[in-house]
């Protein structure tokens, strides 16, 4: 752990020598090359204009009718949208300040969990049920997730059951809390079963079910890997630093897919408007191997920049997305408010030669 801490400190100091005030053109020039793809669709803008508002997407795939799949996206100033793949916002539920979002299918339906930061001193998890036929969200209540301001959230599908969810709550101060959520007749209850701690601000997280690993993005430092099981050690390993080459701070959204018998981790390299794809080695202490980088360039729809949240899911999503769907928040959607861009996984896979 001393070696990891030293590496983290070195990265932090390096970041201090290269502030975000450096022009983005310079950051792009200094980073490793990235191939380009274009969006095949985009969502309607979030309702909050002239602000950093759109934040994080989650995808629900309709196996019976893939083209009828849905995207849940947060307006972190106001609530959650439900989008269809044509980009239209079919429903909005006011929820105030909600940052990240994730979802899972259970016996109780499609459960949506969002990080709720309406109280910056006491984080909460806001729970909803997604009705895919009506394309609506119904509030199921909130559960306390401990002191601090809520930022990231990810569900551990491999450790969740029909009546219980395991989630990781990423708190702005660097705390990562592993929480068991139970759905009762009077609303959800939460029990914190493990707490990890990183030194500075975090947000994005994702669980790899194959290796039972939790990945957490420390924005100015890099991606950390922890064992996901509740009884595992609370120490992690820095496996992908924000070195200005493979990733440029901030590291923001994280997403994971399994394809061809391997796991791929995708990270938003916010500082150079790119996305980095890593392999996930069996050795939990090994650096993540870089598989490639890509950007979403302007085409029929605009480019993306300064992306916060991302999500990717493989499978058939209809004729435009036959191999899978990648959704990315767009931090600059001028002259309109921020939104989410939709890209086919086939195009990303082909461009990177995966």
Positions of the model-derived regions?
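Sec-dependent signal peptide recognition
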Residues: 2-8
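Bacterial N-terminal signal peptides
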Residues: 8-15
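Sequence/structural signature of beta-propeller domains
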Residues: 17-354
């Amino acid at each position: 752990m001393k070696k990891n801490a030293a590496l983290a400190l070195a990265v932090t100091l390096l970041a201090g020598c290269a502030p975000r005030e450096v022009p983005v053109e310079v950051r792009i020039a200094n980073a490793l090359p990235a191939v380009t793809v274009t969006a095949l669709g985009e969502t309607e803008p979030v309702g909050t204009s002239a602000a950093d508002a759109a934040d994080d997407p989650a995808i629900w795939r309709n196996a019976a009718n893939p083209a009828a799949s849905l995207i849940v996206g947060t307006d972190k100033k106001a609530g959650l949208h439900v989008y269809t793949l044509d980009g239209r916002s079919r429903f909005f539920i006011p929820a105030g300040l909600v940052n990240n979002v994730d979802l899972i299918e259970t016996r109780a339906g499609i459960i949506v969990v969002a990080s709720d930061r309406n109280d910056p001193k006491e984080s909460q998890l806001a729970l909803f049920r997604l009705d895919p036929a009506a394309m609506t969200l119904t509030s199921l209540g909130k559960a306390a997730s401990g002191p601090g301001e809520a930022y990231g959230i990810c569900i551990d599908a491999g450790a969740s059951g029909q009546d219980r969810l395991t989630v990781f709550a990423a708190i702005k101060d660097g705390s990562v809390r592993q929480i068991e959520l139970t759905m009762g007749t009077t609303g959800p209850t939460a029990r914190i079963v493990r707490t990890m701690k990183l030194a500075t601000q975090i947000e994005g997280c994702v669980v790899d079910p194959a290796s039972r690993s939790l990945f957490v993005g420390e924005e100015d430092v890099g991606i950390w890997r922890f064992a996901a099981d509740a009884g595992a050690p609370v120490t992690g390993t820095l496996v992908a630093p924000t070195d200005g080459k493979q990733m440029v701070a901030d590291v923001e959204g994280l997403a994971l897919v399994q394809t061809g018998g391997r796991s791929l981790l995708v990270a938003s390299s916010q500082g150079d408007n790119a996305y980095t794809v890593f392999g996930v080695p069996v050795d939990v202490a090994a650096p993540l191997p870089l598989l490639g980088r890509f950007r979403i360039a302007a085409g029929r729809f605009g480019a993306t920049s300064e992306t916060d949240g991302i999500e990717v899911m493989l499978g058939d999503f209809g004729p435009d997305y036959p191999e899978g769907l990648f959704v990315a928040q767009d931090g600059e959607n001028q002259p309109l408010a921020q939104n989410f861009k939709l890209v086919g996984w086939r195009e990303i896979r082909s461009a990177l030669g995966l």
